Amino acid sequence: QRPPYNELMNFLFIADPLESFKIYKDTTFSMMREAQKRGHQVVACEMTDVRWQQGEAVSARVRKIHLTGEQTPWFTETGKHRAALKDFDAVVMRTDPPFDSEYFYATHLLGQAEREGAKVFNSPAALRNHPEKLAIMEFPQFIAPTLVTRSEDDIRAFHAMHGDIILKPLDGMGGMGIFKVGADGLNLGAIIETLNQGGRQTVMVQKFLPGIAQGDKRVLLIGGKPVPFCLARIPQGGEVRGNLAAGGKGVAQPISARDREIAEALGPILAARGLMLVGLDIIGDSLTEINVTSPTCFQEITKQTGFDVAKAFIDALEARLAA
């Protein structure tokens, strides 16, 4: 019997190495801090620590940690042991993309843990079924003109039709590998060659959205409901990419009526599939990506607006566990 959510809980965060956290902006850190503030035990591991062996439950070599409240060291380790994932009240999967074969295998290990009784967020099957770039195909009414193909001819025809286009690989993150080609088609051949690798790699091509000048908006869904503020990531200098990792500037702002319309249409559907935390990327009025692996921007929104996103997330997690 799981405790009602006014009782203290054990949360396992599967994350990137703790030593690499940039705590001034890290979303997983803000989740851990909020959980600890409520008296919950924070435990961490990396995907490399997780194993399944016949006759045993899926388990991990975990680190019990205490957040110090300081910049460095930001945590102290209070113990290390092997524990079954099903013995935690919640397992929060926070490993960054890329969604490569290792990530795919991780979702299967976590799926096995789920069958054994572990409560994993986001749901491993849902992580697998929602590749960040391709998940938008399910909601064509909200997206810009888009093409997904391996064919150079298709890409050239799409360019001839739309003029200004953006080309992106399906497995990039943080704006990696994203190219803009103008109506003149300058460099289109070289870019197709780079991304498409002679027809071996699938490419996504979209009509260029001039709204990017006002920012690539990250709209967060928690338990299917939109956070009232988004983070507009505004390209700097000569960039067409707003991603913070590509030097974009993050400006928090209230979500627009269109942002809310998209969020309220997708929210309940995605939440019902076990996606407790989702980051929608919206440029102008168009949905461009659905991020499910490790959505970020909690700290930026909270610092600029006072809306405590980590609190909203842990509230939703506690409520879900009590349900």
PLM region descriptions:
Residues 1-8:
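Short, Lys/Arg-enriched N-terminal segments with co-localized hydrophobic residues
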Residues 13, 92-93, 206:
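Redox-cofactor binding/interface segments in oxidoreductases and associated redox assembly factors
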Residues 17, 95-98, 170-172, 295:
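Short glycine-rich anion-binding loops that position phosphate/pyrophosphate groups of nucleotides
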Residues 19-148:
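Conserved N-proximal alpha/beta basic substrate-recognition cap immediately N-terminal to
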Residues 36, 114, 159-160, 271:
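Anion (oxyanion) recognition and catalysis
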Residues 42, 120, 165-166, 277:
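Hydrophobic beta-strand scaffold residues
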